[in-house]
Amino acid sequence: MKPVLPDYSKAGVLIVGDVMLDRYWYGPTGRISPEAPVPVVKVEQSEERPGGAANVAMNIASLGGHAHIIGLTGQDEPANVLANKLTSLKVHCDFVALPDYPTITKLRVLSRGQQLIRLDFEDKFENTDAQLILSRMESALPKVRAVILSDYAKGALEHVQQFIQKAKAAGVPVFIDPKGSDFERYRGASLLTPNMSEFEAVVGKVKSEQELVEKGFALIEKFDLGALLVTRSEHGMTLLRRGLEPFHLPTQAKEVYDVTGAGDTVISVLAASVAAGKALDEACALANAAAGVVVGKLGTSTVSTIELAEAVHGSKDTDYGVISEDALIEAVKKAQARGEKVVMTNGCFDILHAGHVSYLNHAAELGDRLIVAVNTDESVKRLKGPGRPVNSTDRRMAVLAGLGAVDWVVPFSEDTPQRLIAAILPNLLVKGGDYKPEEIAGGKEVIAAGGEVKVLNFEEGCSTTEIIEAIKGGRG
């Protein structure tokens, strides 16, 4: 299964959970301390990254999604660092700062790629007022399509049942990364994502895949869950849904370097994909691919849409599929830096026909990469009138992304793609029809940047309008 990446700019996700700051100190070690039998590390580099629920938010932002995070912090320097880092990534931070607690901070000391020690600075948040988070959730829920509850057992989800019910009352699915063996706390969740050890802590030792499936379905019934995704390390993932066959996904990790934050990546990509319109099985396939990427990195890491597309398609030289504007700009820069000629075209492509395919094949032959910009449903309706489009934006983009000639598919909501083309600046802009180059939207900007504009002929006898009329007349 090779799913097409959705447009993550449509994904609004609310994250509620245990936020923390991950700090890393790096340096060489070449001697043992005379004070105790421990290595001496000469710290030469340091780094700070959002961790826990904050890493989930960072993952969603790196995909181009809209992340809104609610969590508990102290009134201290780590809280300011955490908020500043997330805000710089366009994450909306809504922290509850409590004066009697420190912001959870984890300091890791590494040498030659190996973690030597971790130091935790934390006190569990206890007896907090649920309304502090519930009131913030109430304001955020109308703006999102998914909720993630990220539980590290640090106290932010002390009132987790109230949070689940608040989201369900708003009609928003709730995805939970659980902690501990008390799954009763998560009753009614749309999806739980335990790893294998967390799963076995609840159901007992699992000796076979069949036993995993049986015990998993029993958990779904017992705790009134919508679905269960068990992450199984080198054995991949298993998705269990009410009334459906088990869905097994093999691991995509080529090399495991560090599993820190892998669970955060799984739930963030899964929830963002569902929020962007993907079915649960496709979202799990994307999350599985993302996990394979992130375990190959050191420390708490994120996955970009470029990396995710490469993981899904198996190579940096294969089609990337549907992509957000920000990710496309990044991808085009990389392609042009490699000396590749990027070609761009645009259209509604409402009912894809032989004329479209011929045109796109011709366009692809003019360069190394082909971008197709697609009018959104609202844009098509303004241009073509009531009753159009026949196919939704997601379906039109999915079909285009499946063509061998097409590398990237990106949506735009305006009447013309002029702004988008000016942001992308392809090497060659092509358009079908009888236009003059200077009349083509975005043409002036491309030429001013040193690019070219070319008009291609459409194949005669192929027209979306004619196809629609033929179907209406019963000639289809």
From Swiss-Prot:
EC numbers, comma separated: 2.7.1.167, 2.7.7.70
Active site: residue positions: 264
Binding-site residues for ATP, renumbered to this chain: 195-198
A Pfam family per the record: PfkB
Keyword terms, alphabetized: ATP-binding, Carbohydrate metabolism, Kinase, Multifunctional enzyme, Nucleotide-binding, Nucleotidyltransferase, Transferase
Cytidylyltransferase: annotated segments: 344-476
Membrane spanning residue stretches: none
Keyword Translocase: no
Region annotation (Ribokinase) ranges: 1-318
Pathway: Nucleotide-sugar biosynthesis; ADP-L-glycero-beta-D-manno-heptose biosynthesis; ADP-L-glycero-beta-D-manno-heptose from D-glycero-beta-D-manno-heptose 7-phosphate: step 1/4; Nucleotide-sugar biosynthesis; ADP-L-glycero-beta-D-manno-heptose biosynthesis; ADP-L-glycero-beta-D-manno-heptose from D-glycero-beta-D-manno-heptose 7-phosphate: step 3/4
A cellular-component GO term for this protein: cytosol
Swiss-Prot/TrEMBL catalytic activity: D-glycero-beta-D-manno-heptose 7-phosphate + ATP = D-glycero-beta-D-manno-heptose 1,7-bisphosphate + ADP + H(+); D-glycero-beta-D-manno-heptose 1-phosphate + ATP + H(+) = ADP-D-glycero-beta-D-manno-heptose + diphosphate
One GO term of the biological process aspect: ADP-L-glycero-beta-D-manno-heptose biosynthetic process
Quaternary structure note: Homodimer.
Function comment: Catalyzes the ADP transfer from ATP to D-glycero-beta-D-manno-heptose 1-phosphate, yielding ADP-D-glycero-beta-D-manno-heptose.
Family to which this protein belongs: In the N-terminal section; belongs to the carbohydrate kinase PfkB family. In the C-terminal section; belongs to the cytidylyltransferase family.
PANTHER family recorded: BIFUNCTIONAL PROTEIN HLDE (PTHR46969:SF1)
Official protein name in the record: Bifunctional protein HldE
Lineage: Bacteria, Pseudomonadati, Pseudomonadota, Gammaproteobacteria, Vibrionales
Gene label: hldE
